Design a protein with these regions (language model features):
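C-terminal motif of bacterial Sec signal peptides marking the signal peptidase cleavage site
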Residues: 17-19
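An edge-strand/N-cap motif at the start of beta-rich repeat modules
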Residues: 23-62, 68-74
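Repeated scaffold domains used in trafficking and secretory/extracellular systems
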Residues: 23-28, 60-72, 100-115, 158-166, ...
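Short coil/turn segments that connect the beta-strands within blades of beta-propeller domains
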Residues: 33-35, 70-71, 118-120, 168-170, ...
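Short, solvent-exposed loop/turn segments at conserved positions within beta-propeller repeat blades
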Residues: 42-43, 76, 131-137, 178-183, ...
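A short beta-strand motif characteristic of beta-propeller blades
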Residues: 51-62, 90-104, 149-155, 194-208, ...
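Short loop/turn segments that connect beta-strands within beta-propeller blades
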Residues: 52-55, 86-89, 144-148, 189-193, ...
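Blade-level signature of beta-propeller repeat domains, shared across WD40, Kelch, NHL, RCC1
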Residues: 375-412
Length: 412
């Protein structure tokens, strides 16, 4: 029974010698990008905005959930919801939540979520404790970000976690925890103010209760589907394809094993192409890649899978947020993992290049014009790689803290 638990285009010309313990550079880029990196530093989580050319930090922002256009980043400080302008660090607005709420986690390593795909609706959550450790009741606020007002307050008996909210704000999808492992996916009617009596089931086999650990998720550009990457203790990984238009979902099995049997299963990443016509699930630690049809006019389905040479090492972080990107033309899938970076041709699903074989890469990001690929290592170092030649043009350490994710790359 399937189940889920939340648990630049510069060519390297040579090597410049750096002083002992200093930054090692190959060639300082002539153009500059701004890297928005989520880090943990001195007990706090924040977003450091790093200049790729000077290697200096321009500003630090509170860690939060950004809108797709990156005009807003929402965070919670004490009992206030703060709307910050990521471009300047200035506070756009602040509202009192009348209680202690938190942003729902979107990834296994704690990146915040809670936004609808279009950024109009934000859900925050709070819980009442109980003697057995599992919360006895759940409280949620649905906030209209266009007016900065609480639109609905939701109180439920039992332990529920946010899964997704539709673009119109009418449908809220929740994870109802039954015990320490099993749970249901439930649909909450925001307008009617009640849980749908029916459980959101896997339409491929009718299963209701789910188990597994969610690693990350990606929504289609049109906001109709949410795809979440799940791994299980003793069974193969799968993608949970949740329709945001109704009470149904599909579970798409992937090749592999349980993460208790193989820790390499924790290195799955998801990436979707620009028009949303293809989703890729890839694991460089096991050497597996799958192509998925997101189901614009049909049910989502795994179209094909392939194997490639897996990483020789499976050390490194097993809690990265996501480490895969697709080029704008859809021809190349790039994935990072415990043995560097691999470039995969999406037509043949064959690896055509490697880089940073001695790095454990936890996150990737493409520059706006796709001249450069930026890679974040588990140790906090950043590498700049030419997408055209796959050569490394620079490496530096911003010394900002323990990396969580490269959330955004923007032109300077």
């Amino acid at each position: 029974m399937k189940s889920m638990r939340m648990v630049g285009a510069l060519i390297c010309l040579g090597v410049l010698v750096a002083g002992c313990g200093g930054t090692q550079e190959l060639l300082r880029p002539t153009r500059s990008d701004k890297l928005y990196e989520a880090v943990t530093a001195r007990g706090s989580q924040l977003v450091s905005v790093i200049d790729s050319r000077s290697h200096s930090t321009d500003r630090r922002l509170p860690l939060g959930v950004p809108t797709g256009d990156w005009r807003h980043i929402y965070s919670i400080v004490s009992t206030s919801l703060i709307d910050t302008d990521p471009q300047t660090g200035a506070t756009r607005s602040s509202i009192q939540l009348q209680g202690t709420y938190q942003l729902p986690p979107a990834t296994a390593n704690g990146l915040p979520g809670g936004l609808s795909p279009n950024g109009q609706w934000l859900v925050v959550e709070a819980f009442d404790g109980s003697a057995n450790g599992m919360p006895s009741s759940t409280h949620m606020l649905v906030i209209d970000t266009t007016t900065s007002r609480v639109w609905r307050k939701i109180d439920l008996g039992g332990y529920f976690r946010f899964d997704a909210v539709s673009n119109d704000g009418d449908r809220l999808y929740l994870i109802q925890h039954l015990n320490g492992k099993e749970y249901y996916v439930r649909l909450y009617d925001v307008i009617g103010g009640k849980l749908d009596d029916n459980i959101v089931v896997d339409k491929s086999d009718g299963n209701q209760a789910m188990v597994g650990t969610r690693l990350s998720g990606v929504a289609t550009p049109d906001g109709h589907w949410l795809f979440s990457m799940y791994v299980r203790e003793h069974e193969s990984p799968f993608i949970h394809a949740l329709s945001l238009d109704g009470p149904y979902a599909f579970c798409l099995d992937l090749p592999g094993h349980g993460y208790v049997d193989s820790g390499a299963e924790m290195h799955w990443s998801l990436a979707i192409n620009r028009d949303g016509s293809r989703l890729y699930a890839v694991n460089p630690a096991t050497g597996a890649v799958a192509v998925i049809s997101p189901g614009a006019n049909d049910a989502p389905a795994v179209l094909r899978t392939a194997r490639f040479d897996k990483a020789m090492s499976v050390a490194g972080s097993a809690s990265a947020a996501n480490a895969a990107v697709v080029s704008a033309d859809g021809a190349t899938l790039v994935v990072g993992g415990p043995a560097g970076i691999a470039w995969i041709d999406t037509a043949s699903l064959r690896v055509r290049a490697h880089a940073l074989a001695d790095w454990s890469v936890s996150s990737l990001g493409l520059s706006p014009g796709e001249q450069n690929l930026y890679a974040i290592g588990d140790d906090g170092r950043i590498a700049v790689i030419s997408m055209a030649t796959t050569s490394v043009s620079a490496k530096f350490d911003p010394a900002e803290g323990r990396p969580m994710s490269l959330m955004r790359v923007a032109a300077a």
